[in-house]
Regions:
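N-terminal Sec signal peptide and the immediately downstream disordered periplasmic leader
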Residues: 1-84, 646, 657, 677
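Gram-negative outer-membrane beta-barrel transporters
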Residues: 27, 492-494, 617-635, 641-725, ...
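Extracytoplasmic beta-strand/coil segments of soluble accessory domains associated
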Residues: 29-30, 76-121
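N-terminal periplasmic accessory domains that precede
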Residues: 75-78, 98-102, 113-116, 133-136, ...
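Short acidic/polar hinge/loop motifs at secondary-structure boundaries
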Residues: 121-150
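Short strand-turn segments of transmembrane beta-barrel domains in outer membranes
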Residues: 153, 165-200, 209-221, 713
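Acidic/polar loop-and-plug regions of large Gram-negative outer-membrane beta-barrel proteins
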Residues: 226, 237-239, 244-315, 340-388, ...
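Structural signature of Gram-negative outer-membrane beta-barrels, strongest in the C-terminal barrel
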Residues: 393-395, 405-421, 426-430, 434-440, ...
Length: 796
């Protein structure tokens, strides 16, 4: 399968320069390749299977081979080559911020975009605090294709997905294939083995099984094995004359470090002793934390757990063609999800003496918590632990669909979607002091001028008093969603028309509790230290109820005009919605558990018009779009609520070009977005939403030769504002990735991959909106250069 991207003149020039060595391919084969892209069959977000050329939606399909060119180090990095999608993948293996077509990322996660596996949502809400959907999924060799749909047609295809859908479609044994590969980091600590195999057991029974295991420190220095675990997925299919039944299983237990904003200068330069591209505040000298758990019992947390999703999912899929042109489909999944999210965020980076005196008073000093030696550096960090126990994020999802075909071109679909999503977690945060250092930083103790100790082993507070003890919290909630929907499609001559509607309703039930302080002998030594005088725990006795309902209607109407076999144009108008979940708590939920109707749901209105053109070896897919978005949200790191509206317009272009053994792909998205209304901070009205660049792009070239392939990708962005006040601005950047592979034998391949070849600095987010007096900000950047080698054996 292929996708289509903007032609890249730079890569074209490179191709011409080296084309003397190209092994010429048959001209007809090139034409077939070019045609195949727009004729690719897609199933995600459409009422019935269709081709990209015939669809009135913006859809794309990526194979693993196409993803390989961008050399992703995480699942979210693979999303960066999808047109219209802005994936801030600097959080590690998960915890990415993902936006689509100017729809905002006001807090984190992927609020208006749904991530799916085999047609069902991984999480019903894509922006759960510390539970972003990408944390609970992994890209490996069990994936056949990554399909995406952008724009309003997703509004009626899935609940809470008005901006789009990204769907991982698994291999199912239909084509016998298998492989085992091991990838080793050459300049970073990582070893990963992937495996997969699928085939027919009988003429009508087939299976596929695969997954990965890995271990290592990862692309940044943490001082310990921070990435460890793996995944296994399996499916079994029974084919019948008129359909099939498929069973699924997935087990994921994978620890990976979560990268949060880190200290650097406002221009992206590193601070002495802390490399912004390869260091973290994580340290082998700081791996454990003691706190009160969600039941106010003394317990310990392990920072080495990082983001540790524990997922067990089972499901089935049944599709049958019945008499009288009826077709029935049902997809079901039950997921048990729990785990941890443990990481470190610098709440303050500043003068060591000022931080010490803010805790211990005038004359207070700092010392190394391990050695007791006086600490005389100018800078230090006030660290908060993002210590979150994911008690229950399990879900049950079912999507039923019944279709009546009246002809080859006309069909009517009725469907009913139902899901239950649990969101139960405990925030158990503490406060520490650390030296500003990237290689196993030490914890710091603070001592008053009179010798009084204000901390123990670097901990100066059980809780987060610097943030008003905001973040000792317990959530125990359940969200039920029900959505009947209908879709109609027909063809009148050269014009294909589709219309769909969906009615989402749901209810939120449960309770939540905030912080309360008390005196607790946390280390059980019989004495009460200063930090133990005010220990933050959960105010269980005064938990607040969650008891609200929501409902909203969605529609989407589109038309595709096939002007000739190689040219088509389309248009669409849509209205969708997004129910708000956990981020309403501690702010928008009333004392009786109810929520105002306007806060419960955010609506999105979208308009798009596009054109698709195919030449012998070149194809282009261009879409102009406009969106109006409502937003209610809450951000944990800044303790900020949002209540605003956005407007965004832009152009999305996707194209592909084949030339002999060369395969060129690229896409770019130009977006002009602004904050149209803001009920809480009206001074930002008219400003550009934070982190929204005017232009994002992905450009790739792949060259295939007799014994392998080589490729290069350019992934970049123009400059963007750090925050909505539009003061501090990040520079744009282009990240270059490259790979080369060589067949050692018929089935044995060796590949070299380089991510961020030129060690480019690229900032994706920052906590500060303006440059502080000391010029130090807390930001996330893309990782520095990492190089790996993969040995892969294919048995097929």
């Amino acid at each position: 399968m292929t996708t289509h991207h903007t032609p890249l003149y730079l890569i074209s020039a490179l191709a011409l320069a080296v084309s003397q060595g190209v092994h010429a391919q048959d001209e007809q084969e090139t034409k077939v390749q070019a045609k195949q892209g727009l004729e690719t069959i897609v199933v995600t977000g459409v009422p019935r299977r269709t081709t990209i050329m015939a669809s009135s939606s913006s859809v794309s399909s990526l194979s693993l081979e196409q993803v390989e060119v961008s050399t992703p180090r995480s699942t979210a990095e693979a999303f960066r080559i999808i047109p219209g999608v802005r994936a801030e993948s600097t959080g590690g293996e998960g915890n990415a911020n993902i936006a689509v077509r100017g729809l905002p990322v006001a807090s984190g996660g992927a609020k208006f975009l749904q991530l799916q596996e085999d047609g069902l949502p991984v999480m019903q809400f894509g922006d759960v605090a510390f539970g972003n959907a990408d944390i609970f999924m992994r890209l490996d060799n069990t994936v056949q294709t990554i399909e995406s749909i952008r724009g309003g047609s997703a509004s009626t295809s899935a609940s809470n997905a008005p901006g789009g859908i990204i769907n991982f479609i698994s291999k199912n044994g239909e084509n016998e294939s298998g492989s085992v590969s091991t990838t080793v980091g050459l300049d970073y600590d990582s070893v990963r083995t992937d495996f997969e195999y699928g085939t027919y057991l009988t003429d009508s029974v087939r299976f596929h099984v695969g997954g990965f295991v890995r271990q290592g420190e990862g692309p940044r220095e943490t001082g310990y094995t921070s990435n460890k675990g793996g995944q296994i997925k399996a499916n079994l299919t029974k084919d019948f004359e008129n359909g099939y039944v498929r069973l699924y299983y997935k087990h994921l237990d994978d620890k990976s470090v979560g990268y949060l904003p880190m200290p650097m200068y406002s221009n992206g330069d590193s601070i002495a002793g802390f490399d912004a591209q390869s260091d973290t505040p994580h340290s082998a000298l700081f791996t454990k934390t003691v706190r009160l758990n969600g039941e106010n019992q003394i317990s310990s947390g392990d920072l080495r757990d990082g983001m540790n999703p524990k997922v067990d999912a089972v499901g089935f899929e049944a599709v049958f063609d019945l008499d009288n042109d009826w077709r029935i489909e049902n997809r079901f999944r039950k997921s048990s999800i729990s785990g941890n999210f443990n990481s470190l965020i610098p709440a303050e980076v500043g003068s060591a003496s000022s931080i010490a005196q803010s805790i211990g008073g005038v004359g207070a000093t700092l010392s190394n918590a391990n050695t007791g030696e006086a600490f005389n550096d100018e800078l230090a960090m006030r660290i908060h632990t993002f210590d979150v126990t994911l008690n229950d994020f399990g879900s049950i999802v079912n999507d039923f669909k019944l279709t009546k075909s009246f002809s080859d071109d006309t069909s009517l679909t009725f469907g009913y979607f139902a899901s239950t999503q649990n969101i139960a977690m405990s925030w158990l945060w503490n406060s520490y002091l650390m030296e500003l250092k990237g290689d196993n930083a030490a914890l710091l103790n603070v001592t008053a001028a009179d010798g009084t100790e204000y901390s123990e082993n670097g901990l100066y507070a059980y809780g987060t008093p610097y943030w008003g003890n905001c973040c000792q919290r317990d959530y125990d909630t359940e969200y039920d969603t029900r959505a009947p929907y209908v879709a109609f499609s027909t063809k009148l001559g050269d014009v294909s028309i589709d219309a769909s509607a969906r009615y989402d309703s749901g209810e939120a039930r449960g309770n939540y509790a905030g912080a309360v302080t008390s005196t607790v002998d946390m280390n059980r030594d019989g004495t009460i230290s200063i930090p133990e005088q005010n220990v933050a725990g959960i105010d269980i006795a005064n938990a607040s109820p969650v008891n609200y309902d929501w409902s909203y209607s969605s529609y989407s109407v589109g038309a595709n005009y096939q002007i000739d076999p190689s040219l088509a144009t389309f248009a669409r108008i849509s209205k969708g919605g997004r129910a708000n979940a956990d981020r309403l708590l501690f702010g928008k939920v009333r004392s009786d558990g109810s929520v105002a109707d306007e806060d419960a749901v955010d609506e999105v209105n979208q308009f798009e018009i596009g054109v698709k053109k195919r030449f012998d070896s070149f194809s282009v897919f261009a879409t102009a779009f406009y969106a109006e978005t409502e937003e209610q949200n809450f951000e944990a790191t800044s303790q900020t609520f949002f209540d605003r509206e956005y407007e965004a317009k832009g152009i999305e272009v996707e194209s592909t070009y084949f030339m002999d053994a060369w395969d060129f792909r690229g896409n770019f998205t130009w977006t002009d977005a602004e904050i149209a209304k803001d009920a809480l901070t009206p001074e930002v009205v008219g400003n550009t939403p934070r982190r929204q660049a005017d232009l994002i792009y992905s450009l790739m070239a792949r060259y295939s030769y007799d014994k392998g392939a080589a490729g290069v990708s350019f992934i970049g962005t123009t400059d963007a504002y750090a925050q909505d006040n539009n003061d501090l601005k990040f520079d744009g950047y282009t990240q270059v990735n490259a790979f080369v592979s060589y067949d050692l034998s018929e089935n044995l391949n060796l590949a070299l991959n380089v991510n961020n070849l030129f060690d480019t600095v690229g900032i994706t987010e920052a906590e500060e909106g303006s440059v502080p007096e000391n010029d130090i900000i807390r930001a996330r950047t893309i990782n520095g250069r990492t190089t790996s080698v993969t040995l892969k054996y294919a048995f097929n």
